[in-house]
Amino acid sequence: MALPIIIDCDPGHDDAIALVLALASPELEVKAITSSAGNQTPEKTLRNVLRMLTLLKRPDIPVAGGAVKPLMRELIIADNVHGESGLNGPALPEPSFAPQSGTAVELMAKTLRESAQPVTIVSTGPQTNVALLLNSHPELHTKIARIVIMGGAMALGNWTPAAEFNIYVDPEAAEIVFQSGIPVVMAGLDVTHKAQIHAADIERFRAIGNPISTIVAELLDFFMEYHKDEKWGFVGAPLHDPCTIAWLLKPEIFTTVERWVGVETKGKYTQGMTVVDYYFLTGNKPNATVMVDVDSQGFVDLLAERLQYYA
């Protein structure tokens, strides 16, 4: 039986590729997709979800737009990474269908209520929508199998010295998620920076030769440009968000540890930092499965294998 999932995302190049991977995988049943604000404005990320589903010929999947700003802060976007549209690079189709009239939280709640089995929530943007769901529907917590997030880091941040972008955008929301009592799986920068795509990988995807693999290659052509900055020390570009889907499909290519994680919401230098109690110093029981390593070749091979689904 396919694993039922809800994807909450803010496309974004790597979010878009996470959608491509999920919808090429019969092991997963994508029951709903909601959009969050982060990589671009809420209007643009919602439009990008619809554009990707139009490209992938999946207008059957319910879509809803989420919160327009973080719980307690003004919105920060990463247009310097993802471009003016949020998905600069390839020529994507205009949406062929409209989102649901309700909110992301309403669609998530409806999906959870109607599911015969607990649902995994995959969240690849700021945690605002998921936190709002948890706060407004405590009766549905038992319907959530786990929350798999791309966010945080044990070591270095990528938006501030201490904080990864998704968590920094809405640290209060992330703290709600981590302390919810629901199992959390964290794909942080410690692992996603190892899940790099190189120029040869992009050409491998392009050579698959179907329309979707070509679009993915063109998305990566653009995404690579930002990551060529010498300050990062990257050879390729880290594909952050697809790590969440890849973990669901092939957990054996990841190394994980069980640890307690908290989110700093007030620090002068550390707002948005995920504090991972690696050495069990706090006495707190682990609340998260934290990814710490990945077989990077296995990750690339999985993407290449699933791109052939679209032939």
Curated annotation (Swiss-Prot):
PROSITE patterns reported in the protein's UniProt record: IUNH
GO CC terms, sorted: cytosol
Annotated EC: 3.2.-.-
Signal peptide: none
Transmembrane segments: none
Pfam families: IU_nuc_hydro (PF01156)
Protein name: Pyrimidine-specific ribonucleoside hydrolase RihA
Lineage: Bacteria, Pseudomonadati, Pseudomonadota, Gammaproteobacteria, Enterobacterales
Designated gene of the protein: rihA
